[in-house]
Swiss-Prot record:
GO terms for molecular function: proton transmembrane transporter activity. It is a multi-pass membrane protein. It is found in: Cell inner membrane. Required for H(+) efflux immediately after light irradiation to form a rapid H(+) concentration gradient across the thylakoid membranes. Together with PxcL, contributes to transient H(+) uptake following dark to light transition. It holds the Pfam family CemA. GO terms for cellular component: plasma membrane. InterPro entries: CemA. It comes from Rippkaea orientalis (strain PCC 8801 / RF-1) (Cyanothece sp. (strain PCC 8801)). This is Proton extrusion protein PxcA.
Amino acid sequence: MKLKSLIKSTSDWFSSTPERALNRAYKSALKIQEIETKHFRGQKVSRENADYGASVITYFETEVQSYLQKINMELTVFKASRLFLSLSNLQDTENNLGTGKVKSEQETTAIIIFDKLKFIDEVIAKYKSNAIEKNVSNNVAIIAASERNPEVTNSAPSGKKSTKVKDQGVKNKTINFESASQKTGVLPRSFMNTLNKIKQEIDPKSGESEEQVLTKYRKSRYRTALSIKFILLLIIIPLLIHQLTKTFFLIPVVEQYFSRHEQVIFINRDLEDEALEELQHYEETLHFRGLIGLGPELSPEKIEQEVKQKAGEITEEYRRHGIDSIANIFADLFSFIAFVLVLVNSKKEIEVVKSFLDEILYGLSDPAKAFLIILFTDMFVGFHSPHGWEVILEGVAHHFGLPENREFNFLFIATFPVILDTVLKYWIFRYLNRISPSAVATYKNMNE
C-alpha cells in the first residue's frame, strides 16, 4: 500500500513539473517587469532609461541577468517535461477526447499557458542580445585567436584589440594552433622566458606594459575558469548520462527480459562456479558450527531447508549482478557517445584547455617534471605495474560481467605497457628534450 502511494505521489509530482517550471519562469518575468516599472519608467534596464550611477545600473543589470537565466532554465525544463509527458500520455489523451469536461479543462489550461508564455516572451524580447552569453563567446574567440597569434593582442591599441583579433582570426583560419610544446628553439624555453620578462620590465613604454600585463591576467583568469568548467563537464555529463540511462531505461528493460526467461540465472560460467562455491561453503559452515557447538545441531532436513533458502538468496543476487552487468555495457556506450558529442561541439574550448594544460605542464620546475614522469612510468610501465594492470582488467571484466580470461590478461600485460613506455620515451626525447633539456637530465639522474 505504501509503495502504491509512493508511486502515485511521484507520478503526480512529475506530472506537475511543467506547471511548476512555467510558474517559476513567470514569477521571474514579473520580477523583471517590477524592476522596469519602479526604476526605469517601464523600459528596458539600461543606462539610457535612468539617471542612476554606474554601480546602481550594474546592480540592476546583474539582477535582470540572473532572472533571465532562471527563465531560460525553467523554460527548458518546461519544454522537455511537457514533451515527455505528451508522449507518455498520448493514449490517455486519445481515450478522453470525447469527454466534455476533460476537453474544457484542457482548453482552459492551454489558454493559461499561452498567456504566461506570451508575457514571458514580451519581457525577455528586450534582452535577446544577452550580454553574458555574448561576452563568453567573445572571450572564447579572443583566447583561441590570441593563442594562435599572440602578436595580435599585444600589438593592437586598446580601443581596437578585439576588432583586430577577430579580423586576424578570419584571415588566418588555416594557421594551426601553436601550443607550448611547439614553441621550441635553439635556447631552452625557460631561458627565453626569463629574457622576455627582463625586457618587458625595462621597457620604457611602461603604460603599454601595464596594459599588456592586465590583459594577460584577465585572459589567464578567464582561461583557467573556462578550462576547469569544461573539464568538469567532460566528467559530469558522461557520469550523469550513465546513471540516468541505466536507472530509468536499461535496467527495467533487462529486468523484463530476465522475468520472461526465468531459467537464465548466470550470464557466464565463472559466476555459476562462484555461486556454487558460496553455497557449498554455507552448507559446510552449518555442519561445522553444529559440530563444535557454536550453533544448534541441525537435522539433515533442517540443513536442506537452510541451504534451499540460501540458494534462493544467491540466485537473486547473481541475477541482479547479471542485470547490472548487461546494463553497464549499454550505459557505458551512451556515456561514450555523450563524451564524444561534448568534444565535437567544443572545439574552441578544447583549444583553450590544451593551452591551459600546456602552461601547467611546461611551467613546472624541472625536478617536478622528472618526479611526475618517474611516478607515471613506475606506476604504469614499471616493475610492479603487471599487478596493477591485473587488478584493472579483473575490475573491467567484473563490471561488464565477462568471464576472466587469463591468456588475454597475460597478453595485454605483455604488450600494452611496452607500447605505453615507447610512446612516453618518444614524447620525452621528441618534445621535452627540446623544450626543457634540464628536466630530461634530471629525469635521467633520478632514474639512475
